[in-house]
Amino acid sequence: MELNALIKKIESVDSYAREFLKKFEIKQEKGKFLFIAPGEDYREWLETIVNTFLEEEVRKLIEVKEKEEKKKVEIKDFLNPKYTLENFIVGEGNRLAYEVVKEALENLGSLYNPIFIYGSVGTGKTHLLQAAGNEAKKRGYRVIYSSADDFAQAMVEHLKKGTINEFRNMYKSVDLLLLDDVQFLSGKERTQIEFFHIFNTLYLLEKQIILASDRHPQKLDGVSDRLVSRFEGGILVEIELDNKTRFKIIKEKLKEFNLELRKEVIDYLLENTKNVREIEGKIKLIKLKGFEGLERKERKERDKLMQIVEFVANYYAVKVEDILSDKRNKRTSEARKIAMYLCRKVCSASLIEIARAFKRKDHTTVIHAIRSVEEEKKKDRKFKHLVGFLEKQAFDKIC
């Protein structure tokens, strides 16, 4: 029997059949006609007609199934509700990033895509990404926020469990993807391949992608050219904290911690902080121990860093002022990078604190020095033993 003849038989039983059958997907498989119903009601309607009104030989030609609904992908968004666009403090250095994100939220995926925000540590990138996520979620969009490091770790876990398709489907089902700390994709080749395919899928579906990094895409060493090219394919926005914005943030944080400080303390905070994390850390310490407690702690930390520099200078027989200068001879350069490394490992100093102690404008040099020491330790056993020896000596003598 041909399909047209079969349909006429069904239509002869029910006057509404012509309209109802338009809702079905009809396939011919293994000598049978498969009618795929869009829902339970349609399936029951056709089964009733087939089983009640059609002859046995015709019934054998028909199979009725209900359309299988795709399982809804469960999304863990990792958003912190404390970050909002309303409490993001806007100034000259971050206004463009803020405005671009706000505009993108009005036209997800079609106006600026991707958005790549870059700037130093603690300039508000995470706050802005989280705030964008919370705003989009409030409007009913599906959102995921993740750091590149967390993305990599989750991917590895899913590979081990054999559930990598679940991981891919979760990321590919969102309306807004927020990836923070993009610099941590560096050197992770398998992670980059996975992210590249997720990025492409979302981009082709016109879903919004917002990325944040501590450096411009061109400076992302160890990240593939094709990913860098994708990052540069949208809009690049630098984010900075100028003095006026930092002053606003200090005032806001003081309100948050219910503190009133005299002008000279606020001036001290302005002069001795570069980012939001430092501001928050120092205000917390003032709340706990008072301004004098903060001064004592910072003096002690600075002294420890200088003791590390002096210790390394003595070992390498170079001058402290040479380590703190821009001298580039081999001996001084090695002493400098090891001193920076020990300041981080032995004293747990922040990158910015180390940069300040070594009279550097930002922490990029410090990151490079620490990475250089770690890479050389992997390649050179003698160097590894030397660094281990100096680390133990510094810890015993200074900390």
Curated annotation (Swiss-Prot):
Region ranges (Domain III, AAA+ region): 78-290
InterPro entries xrefs: AAA+_ATPase, Chromosome_initiator_DnaA, Chromosome_initiator_DnaA-like, Chromosome_initiator_DnaA_CS, DnaA_C, DnaA_dom, P-loop_NTPase, Trp_repressor/repl_initiator
Record-linked Gene3D superfamilies: 1.10.1750.10, 1.10.8.60, P-loop containing nucleotide triphosphate hydrolases (3.40.50.300)
UniProtKB keywords: ATP-binding, Cytoplasm, DNA replication, DNA-binding, Lipid-binding, Nucleotide-binding
GO cellular component, one term: plasma membrane
Chief localisation class: cytoplasm
Family annotation (SMART domains): AAA, Bac_DnaA_C
Region entry Domain IV, binds dsDNA, spans: 291-399
Entry's family note: Belongs to the DnaA family.
This protein's name: Chromosomal replication initiator protein DnaA
Native source species: Aquifex aeolicus (strain VF5)
